[in-house]
Design a protein with these regions (language model features):
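N-terminal accessory segments that position/regulate proteins before the catalytic core
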Residues: 1-167, 171-172, 213-242
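Short acidic/His/Gly/Ser-rich catalytic and metal-binding motifs that mark active-site loops
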Residues: 173-177
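Short pre-catalytic strand/loop immediately N-terminal to key active-site residues, enriched for Gly-Thr
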Residues: 181-189
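C-terminal substrate/ligand-recognition segments
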Residues: 194
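Structured binding elements
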Residues: 205
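Active-site cores enriched in adjacent His and Asp/Glu residues with nearby glycine-rich loops
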Residues: 208-210
């Protein structure tokens, strides 16, 4: 088999006894942990989370990829719960805010965007989850479902589901400490978040499907990110399973 860029990536980002990737930490230039759109309209998120009738074991047993949804809106409360459970702030200790998922070095390079197709109390559009302010920031108004489906290799569930969650990485948050090995960690971080999302959705009777097939730059354009400093990694649709 002919080697390619993936093989080189795996080889070049290995630790060895002779070489640990990373370097001296430049605390004066540590990247910001949180992203915010100061001029965007903020939608406060409710904290009265839905109750789950499933145990953790039952949620694990029932989780599956769902690709067909009823045309029912998602409630804002359900969306708020999913956002918090997937990557919200769980506790504060020693000056750090820790989240519901692990992250290499507690650097949290992943940002969450929401393509709203059908959520009670929200206009259709593109939103950013402001974790620190526990709110949604409205970035664009309009119906982006078909555009997302087109960008996701014509996967129509991106238009049919009430929401599409889009996870991006702000790479320098991790590269600041881990240099090139950070690229391994950001993908792991996205996976942690996606699994939390999948189990949380199952626990309240919703379904999800994680999506890794998409045209990166088309999704980046929908979000308004540059694809260099910040770029899409992963998607998930969520809705009421048929």
């Amino acid at each position: 088999m002919v080697e390619g860029i993936g093989d080189e990536f795996q080889r070049s980002t290995k630790h060895s006894r002779e070489r640990l990737l990373g370097g001296r930490l430049d605390w004066a230039n540590k990247p910001e942990t949180y992203k915010e759109y100061p001029s965007a309209r903020k939608v406060p998120l409710p904290r009265n989370f839905p109750s789950s009738t499933l145990s953790f074991l039952e949620a694990v047993k029932k989780r599956k990829s769902v690709r067909s949804f009823f045309p029912e809106p998602l409630s804002l409360g359900d969306l708020a719960f999913l956002l918090w459970a997937s990557t919200g702030i769980q506790r504060a200790e020693q000056g750090y805010e820790f989240r519901t998922v692990p992250s290499a070095g507690a650097l949290y390079p992943i940002e969450t965007y929401v393509i709203v197709n059908n959520v009670g109390g929200l206009e259709k559009g593109v939103y950013h989850y402001n974790i620190l302010a526990y709110s949604l920031e409205e970035l664009k108004n309009g119906d982006f479902g078909e555009e997302m489906a087109h960008a996701a290799l014509e996967q129509k569930i991106c238009a049919a589901a009430p929401v599409v969650l889009v996870w991006t990485a702000v790479f320098n948050r991790s590269k600041w400490k881990y240099a090139q090995r950070a690229y391994r960690y950001v993908y792991l971080d996205a996976g942690h978040i996606a699994q939390n999302l999948a189990l949380s959705a199952t626990s309240i009777g919703l379904g999800s499907c994680q999506i890794g097939a998409f045209f990166d730059e088309e999704v980046n354009q929908i979000l308004g990110v540059d694809g260099v400093e910040e770029s899409v990694l992963y998607l998930s649709v969520v809705g009421h399973p048929r």
